[in-house]
Structures are given as structure tokens and as C-alpha cells.
Amino acid sequence: MNLNQLYYFQKVAQLQHYHQAAKELNISQPSLSRSIANLEEELGVSLFQKNGRNIELTKYGSIFLEHVNHIIDEIKIAENKMKSLAGSSSGHIDIGYVFPLAKSYIQ
């Protein structure tokens, strides 16, 4: 299982349509289907069931989605925290001054 599979699963669950999810994820629909099939094989359960042209989460899919949403939320929180920490310890500051006045203060 990898992080991309979790993102893919979340998007398919949200849109309930492989083609639309693949388009939004900028991957081919066969690649998306293969990724979800590999995830289902690894978990040993079916995450989706077909309903006409659309798909629906199975009971296992619904339970797994709760965990995936939590995992992805935690990753976003961690990313934001790291960006915030990195931003507070470095950056760019522009300082302007009037030379005659600054000469007496900066020595």
C-alpha cells in the first residue's frame, strides 16, 4: 500500500466514478483501476461495488475511507506544520534606510 493508492481511493470514493476520478488525478483510467484493484487485493476485501455506470463503497470501503480521510488529514497537518516551521526560521527581509541617518546608528 502506498500514499498514491490512498489518494486515488479517496478521490474515487468522493466522485463514485473511475473516469472522472482519473481525469481529476491526471492519470489514465486503466492505471487508476489497476491501483484500486491492487489495493483491494492487498486488503483482501472489495472496496467498491458497481451500480450501473457508477460505483458505490462497500461496507469495507466505507470503513476504510474513514481511516484514509484521517491519514490524509494528518499528512496535510504535518506538511503545513513543517512549512510553517521552515518559514519561521528562514526567509527574506528587505531593509531600507536613509544613508546619513543610518551612518550614526550602524557602526
Which residues does each predicted region cover?
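The N-cap/first-turn positions of alpha helices
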Residues: 2-5, 29, 61, 68
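Hydrophobic residues on short alpha-helical segments
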Residues: 6-13, 58, 65
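Short helix-boundary/capping micro-motifs
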Residues: 10-31
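Helix-turn-helix DNA-binding elements, focusing on the entry/boundary residues of the two helices
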Residues: 17-18, 36, 50
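N-terminal winged-helix
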Residues: 30, 80, 84-107
